[in-house]
Amino acid sequence: MNSIQVKNEPMLASFASTSTNGKAKRSAKPSLFSGSEVSSDDDEEKPLAKRPKVEDSDSDAPLTSTVSSQNGVQKRSGSSNNDDNDDDSDSDSDAPLTALVKKSNGSDDDEDDDDDDDEGDDDDEEDDDDDDDDDDKPLSKSSKSNRKPPKTMSITGSGEKKWDVLIHKGPRFPDPYQPLPKDVKLKYDGRPVDLPWQTEEIAMFYAVKLETQHAQNAIFNRNFFDDFKTDLKKYPPRDGTQIKSFDKLDFRDMYNYWRSLKDAELERKKALAPSARKREIEERKAEETKWKICLVDGVEQRVGNVNVEPPGLFLGRGAHPKAGKVKRRISPGDITINHSADHPAPQPPAGMGDWAEVVEKKDVTWLAYWKENINGQYKYVFLDATSNFKTNSDREKFEKARKLDTVVKQIRRDVNKNLKSKVRHERQIATIVWLIDNFSLRAGNEKGEDEAETYGVCSLRCEHAQIKMPDTIHLEFLGKDSMKFEEDLKITNPDVFKNIAMFLKSNGMKDKSGNYVRKKPSDPIFCAPESGSGKMQPLQPNSVNQFLSKYMKGLSAKVFRTYNASVTFQGLLEQTEEWLKSRPNAAEREINQTNLRLAYNEANRQVAILCNHQKTVNPMLLNRNLERTQDKIFQIRYEIMKEQQKILTFHKVSELKKEFKVKEHPFMKQFDKIMQKQDLDAEKVKQYEEQMISDKKSKLESTFKRQQSELQYQLEQKGLTGDDGTPKKGKKAKNVEEEVRSSIKGFKDKKQVDEELKALNETAKRLEKERKTNKSQATSCNFVSSAKKILSKYEMIKKQEAELVNKNNTSDVALSTSKLNYIDPRITLAWLKEWDDRLSDLGQGKAAPKKKVKKEEEENDIKPKKKDAKGAASKKRAAKTGLANSTGDSEKMELGLQVMNISQFFANALQKKFKWAASGDDGRDISAKWVFVKDAQSKMRKLDSAERKGQKGGSMAAMTDAADSKEAQPKVNCVLKKQTSADRKMSKPIKAVDKTEESDDDLSSDSSDDEDKPLAAVV
């Protein structure tokens, strides 16, 4: 097979990166690992690796001889077809397969190429693709001496033809690197270093992260410097500088230059006329659309993320060991294109060489793939989430999870039976399935030493677990994407608890003396002897899926997670009204849109915790949120103080109490609160008022500049300016100019702006006088109005404080991941319809006045009006046929809601992705009575972790547990509480095994047989 040379060097505009011979190769089909696609869509298309089948014929034979690699070791045959292999992927198994897959973890979340990753909203987790396909991949060997390169297969699909004609433009490349000006240099030991552009670019990767949390990470810095030194050997400084110490590097000049470019671009955009800015955006979107549209069998389909990831530094998620390593620039010579052979293939950018290969694979749906250098993952360009391929995949995934409901009782009965099996392998599988089912843990994989050490149930080591009598297991390990999992799991099934304690102690094998071999901390909890060496290796997730597939074709651990997440979510939403009634104050108990959204988010939060959907905590963002909230609260308290000042200037407290009786004025019950002194720092009040006036002046001046820029731009477009840019004279030109002025929203001339600036100066003087005299300069005061304003502002403070608590409680919980990948969207839509009908019945169905105001404002806006009644046709069709979503009139779903706003629950991207969900099982518009499963509340899963991530006021699940504590299946009896760093510090050190004599006695006291003793290992 011809080899393809992967170009790791970054490129200049004039630098062409090619394959080995400088031309595109039509080589034999390259071998690939399974990897992740570029887009943030669900990875359901990625195929699973072919797996070796474990023969179970002698699984119950005891191991009576000494531990060795000779006879008595279980043999593994080659890969064989089974149900799990046939249908374990929830959709198109069309990405390249491998015979043995190196587990690729730590999907990079650093698509940005600057420090804006720390400035965005951390709740934007739609790019967190949380598939568990990795659960089904075979394990890599952990032994350094025995590790071999993985064997691979050629590109293969599912065998089923997906398309006849596929035409697209290929992936889009990032801009080439532009060298720095000669006066901007990296400094070493205080002296400028003359770097060639290849290493200068890598230094710039670090410079742009200088003011982020990443630059404070020792692992990040070490990995960067290691890669930087490697490149310095290839492209050393031209002035001969020897760079040996990271601490002597100074990136400040490079950062300042980059920051100046960012600031200049921001100022340029601010200076643009609104119409010019809008036109610029439209042109950019039009250019992007050329890349984002492809033809599949003559039908236009949207493509997902077509952009090749730009080079930079790998950020990773969690405590990723490869954070800071250099992501190399991808060239056309690294990319394979999938395209119709009878149509011209897309051309790579000029001067960058040819594609590695162009193929025609009609049984796959990827458009292109390439390999990234950090984790060896293959990244793919797929169609967009709204494409037919993806929407069908999503529906099939959730329908498979619904089908599980028909066999789940039988599975659980058999699991409970196998927990007491004499066959160790069966008992291990049953214990694993019980943990996956009850705690929604991932099956997981062991990693090689060159990969991020992350784990799931199957690959857990003894050092990850600690027995806590009488019924608790403490687990602490790095989960998917290097996110830390640390929980105390209360095991309600005594057999499970006893099994785990047993598996922690021994693998069932005996030494020469006939004693059971005690496990070491690094030994796997669930294990079987490896073929050939006899060494105990973690049980493969494939073993779990083989067990599950006996009950339903394609059933895997991930389907269980999807089923439990959706069932629990439905069960929680069914308790919405009860949860609202349980809220601590009257305002929170009201049935309205705001409180319903809080109830929905509470259910979403609990399911996210159930699935252990974490996200990287950004301390800088948390601090900014805290500062912003504190500033908002100070502003509100300042406004309260000014109202109080006004009241005390015009009224006496004693007279107010006499004049305004509680009977006629109920708000007087809170009179003491109304007049409570705010105790604001005088200097801070002065600074706030001065800043407030300054901000208003700046806003007024910037608005004036923007309006003048808009006026100039529109006159230029109409040809009414001279060569010097000044407006033309003449009656006609003047009339047109007046029309343009009137079309600009809120247009003010220079005279009006000067008058307002003068008024602001007067306000500043008035505020200064009020500070000195502590008397209001207002002309009058309406006490009732001021009192009600003060009380409303106290409520605003409560909301701000509650929002801050909510953000802190969910700072490490990825709410959107479960909604995107694990919760059937039809549950949300049916719930929305139900409550929309109820709110309409309560008289809350009238349109909000805000929309009318918006339309009136748009008449005077410079921007073109939006299309009115975009969904009117769909609503009329729905009224007649019940099929509002049967045609492609809109990319988003049409539910015909009168009160509830779907955008508050599903962002536009999710509405497009889940448009299929607006139709029920009968193909008609989804009904408010649609359910994922019947009797969901009795099937909800347990959630111990939420007991420490509780939210004051209780949770829906806590009510479920209190209402029916007799259910055999434990429910989500929890409240949510954010775990603090102090909580973690109080945790006891992890032990491989609880070796106390009391533990051994407790484990054996309730059994008359030898179930508590280590079972014989399979041979």
Curated annotation (Swiss-Prot):
Q: List cellular component terms (GO).
A: chromosome; nucleolus
Could you confirm whether the keyword DNA-binding appears in this record? yes
Q: What class of enzyme is it?
A: isomerase
Residues of the active site are: Y822 (o-(3'-phospho-dna)-tyrosine intermediate)
**Which UniProt key words apply to this protein?**
DNA-binding, Isomerase, Topoisomerase
What CDD domains does the record point to? Topo_IB_C, Topoisomer_IB_N_htopoI_like
What the entry lists under PANTHER family is as follows:
DNA TOPOISOMERASE 1, DNA TOPOISOMERASE I
- Recite the other comments: Eukaryotic topoisomerase I and II can relax both negative and positive supercoils, whereas prokaryotic enzymes relax only negative supercoils.
Q: Which family does it belong to?
A: Belongs to the type IB topoisomerase family.
Q: State the protein's name.
A: DNA topoisomerase 1
- Organism, per UniProt? Mycosarcoma maydis
The uppermost taxa in this organism's lineage are: Eukaryota, Fungi, Dikarya, Basidiomycota, Ustilaginomycotina
